[in-house]
Amino acid sequence: MDLGLYSIDLPFEFATKKEVGIIVPKRLRYRWELILGDSKIELPRLLKDLDSIDVFFHNSLHIYEHMMFEFKTAWPKIKKNGILISDDIHLNNSFIDFCKAVKCKPIILSANLGIIVK
């Protein structure tokens, strides 16, 4: 069983790994892997090596096409009863459109945060 925590982020000229993973608790850092690169390349590559995922959290480029790409790419690997979380859902209709496409009712936690349970 692979219990990993993965982040994909573009390299920042002045950011450190600590700044990028600030939300990762210290007790879980040993399971965390930071992958630097474009998620359009790195996300499919990562998912190819994983059997399934429990949680997918989108918090990268918040334009419609990119959000839909990440949702559509991650969704097939999300386990039954797994969750997809998206930040900044108020910026465009991608989250709601994706919920309709996969026939799942969205859970809107705030104006900018939504969840889908598979």
Residue map of PLM features:
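S-adenosylmethionine/decaboxylated-SAM
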Residues: 1-118
